[in-house]
Amino acid sequence: MRCTILTLFPEFFDSPLDAGLMGKARESGLIDVALVNPRAYTTDRHSTVDDRPYGGGPGMVMRVEPWEKALQGIEEPGRILMMAPKGRPFTQAMARELAQEESLTILCGRYEGFDARLEEIYPIEAVSMGDFVLNGGETAALAVLEAVSRLVPGFMGKEESGTEESFSAGLLEYPHYTRPEDYAGHVVPEVLRSGDHGRIAAWRKECSLRLTLSQRPDILPEAQLDEADMDFLRGLSRNRPGRNLYCALVHYPVVLKEKNSGATSLTNLDIHDIGRSSCTYGLGGFYVTTPLEDQRRLLDTLLRHWTLGPGSRSNPDRAEALGRIKGVDDVRAAIEDIARRTGQVPYVVGTSAKGAGNATPASVRAMLEERPVLLVFGTGHGLAPEVLEGCDAILRPLRWMDGYNHLSVRAAAAIIMDRLLGDCY
């Protein structure tokens, strides 16, 4: 594979390209790396490669001319990557994809980045190493080059080395041990000394699963899992922020069809479905709020039937879900009940299909790490203004990019729970 790196600081790569396996791969001709400095393609005596941005603002911007001329000088550029924070996240899957290419070209940005016209002239793919900022693209380019090169056949020597490491199957790698067998009382696990390859493979897989759940649960949804893996993961203890999440279905005050505030009647489907969703996602509780006595009696009758009466015997799963439901007069009563149960006053997060909101699923997950969160859902045409005004935050609406986002409250509740907690939290 041939890789051409365009950089203002070619000396940055001197040591890394000569060290270890990369140095051996270059010596053998397996990997060919060319360093091109765009300053060589400037025409002024100062070798200027940047200039002030149009429209004002801080910093300098890379000029088009020297970079375009440098690209023109590459006989076979192959895919052209630009290391930039705005780019597509670099992953192991992308590394495998790029390892199939015969040629790659990597542009290392500096300052405020490139004149955008360079991307109009060439089919450049912006690639990011993560949500952080570096002084330039050289460090990122080196990471890409190494990740891709080690997947080229022959680079690693033993091919399994590249396929058994972290992320190869969407999981973190298992721990490694070497001699001595006992170091200051820290002993190598017996299974690794047993010589039983089947037990060793099973132990390593379980370690990978355990580490991934503990350290990177966010990558589990895309991991390669079989049914045995899923059974093993279910049996592990884990952080359960969902237990810190509560929801309330508000029937007063809500917006009515006439746009005034008032009360709505309880709906059997809403209670059942949100109750089942709350149980599925492991919420701490589900409150149904209504100050109307006849509606409270109706709720009590329904809950008794499913949790204590004939319904509990015919459908134990439904009994478990509806057993988490509690009727209260209003949102304030739900807040007070959560405070009594947990010793902490919850954050109150409202929901609405209108407006921009000021909270996202990620920010609500962060709240869950601090103290309980009460999600508030409105019936009718949504929560009344006075309820929303009393919330600590309001979630951004679902499907806000499209013109139609008229979901039933039970559908919205299920979607929001899934976005907050997914399969692993």
UniProtKB/Swiss-Prot annotation:
Residues 242-425 are annotated as: Unknown. One of its GO terms (cellular component) is cytosol. It comes from the Bacteria. Specifically methylates guanosine-37 in various tRNAs. Its EC number is 2.1.1.228. Homodimer. S-adenosyl-L-methionine binds at residues 109, 129-134. This is tRNA (guanine-N(1)-)-methyltransferase. Belongs to the RNA methyltransferase TrmD family. Keywords: Cytoplasm, Methyltransferase, S-adenosyl-L-methionine, Transferase, tRNA processing. Residues 1-241 are annotated as: tRNA (guanine-N(1)-)-methyltransferase.
